[in-house]
Every structure is written in C-alpha cells, then in structure tokens.
C-alpha cells in the first residue's frame, strides 16, 4: 500500500468513526431528524471505508 493509499484509507476510517460519534450525540439530544441524516451519512462513510479497504488493501483492522 502506498503512502497516499494509506492516507486515504485512514481518512475514510476517521470519517466513519466521527459520523458514528456524531450520531450518538444527536440521539442523546433527541434530534431525530438530524440523527436520521447522520445515520445515512454514517452508512455512506462505512461503505466508502469498505470500498477503500477492498481497493487499497488490508490495514490490519478488523471490520
């Protein structure tokens, strides 16, 4: 895996993690409409991470 590929994979993993954290916070605030949007965003972030992982290779993290 090249440095650029590793960077892209790390960024995708970070975005996936942050959208999940945001979703938890929105649920705590009972912000249902925003939580629904964030859940969709998290699903896309997870899909992006898995796609990058498949394309660029395994970084040793368990899905």
UniProtKB/Swiss-Prot annotation:
<dbReference type="InterPro" id="IPR000769">
    <property type="entry name" value="Regulatory_Rop"/>
</dbReference>
<comment type="function">
    <text>Regulates plasmid DNA replication by modulating the initiation of transcription of the primer RNA precursor. Processing of the precursor of the primer, RNAII, is inhibited by hydrogen bonding of RNAII to its complementary sequence in RNAI. ROP increases the affinity of RNAI for RNAII and thus decreases the rate of replication initiation events.</text>
</comment>
<dbReference type="GO" id="GO:0042802">
    <property type="term" value="F:identical protein binding"/>
</dbReference>
<comment type="subunit">
    <text>Antiparallel homodimer.</text>
</comment>
<keyword id="KW-0805">Transcription regulation</keyword>
<dbReference type="Pfam" id="PF01815">
    <property type="entry name" value="Rop"/>
</dbReference>
<keyword id="KW-0614">Plasmid</keyword>
<keyword id="KW-0804">Transcription</keyword>
<protein>
    <recommendedName>
        <fullName>Regulatory protein rop</fullName>
    </recommendedName>
</protein>
<dbReference type="InterPro" id="IPR035962">
    <property type="entry name" value="Rop-like_sf"/>
</dbReference>
